[in-house]
Amino acid sequence: MKILYYIYQICIALPILLVLTILTAIVTIIGSLLGGAHFWGYYPGKIWSQLICLFLLIPVKIHGREKLHGKTSYIFGPNHQGSFDIFLIYGFIGRNFKWMMKKSLRKLPFVGKACESAGHIFVDRSGPKKVLETIRQAKDSLKDGVSLVVFPEGARTFTGHMGYFKKGAFQLADDLQLAVVPVTIDGSFEILPRTGKWIHRHRMILTIHDPIPPKGKGMENIKATMAEAYAAVESALPEKYKGMIKNEDQDR
């Protein structure tokens, strides 16, 4: 069965998805320029992500979406198991949001320009002024019910285990007094681990935990929220992936 699936993904699924990716990028760029990034920066990417899971025959299960309220803006903090985290969140979290992503992703053909047009936020750590500009852009995006998705680990896992959480997302939530929503991704590591070359068919599960409202302001609130979010995300992982293992490139 694995051999048949590999043949299917190479000969049928991947060519279709390549065309879909280019078309989605073009639609996002043109739509964002003409009609605003609020709609065009989210819905084409959402449909694209759902189609990727559909064509690759990947089942998806969602828990906890009912915990999100109305047009409230949140900062989502998921673990980062692999590349398919993007499709799971974009396609199935059910909230209009902006990504906070590495600056290097801007260089990706079509996709980088589409992300820029959609208003997603590229993190530039080249100097204090660039960091402040990134924070300002993030603050500006969090309006009209739009949320922000940040991977607190900052890098995909090599092992399936979570690394430590960096404080950036939690500091932003503290500054804006927004709730942090811990999100657990399970199954993405089995589909395409960081060092993997082939896509493996496996179910993905997205678990949305209770929002963590601010309990004050300052470093004490930041540390408490980080600890609570980490425990929540880890709680929905399989036993084999529980326990922190630092990623070798997390400090970059």
Question: What is the meaning of each model-derived region?
Answer:
Residues L4-I7, L132-R252:
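Non-catalytic C-terminal accessory region of glycerolipid acyltransferases
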Residues I52-C53, C115, S141, A173:
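A generic structural signal for well-ordered alpha-helical segments
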Residues E66-K67, R106, G127, G187, ...:
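Residue-level detector of flexible, active-site-proximal loop/helix-junction positions
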Residues T24-I47, L54-L56, H63, H69-P128:
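Catalytic core of membrane glycerolipid acyltransferases/transacylases, capturing the structured
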Residues L4-L33, P59:
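A hydrophobic membrane-anchoring feature enriched in long, contiguous, low-charge segments
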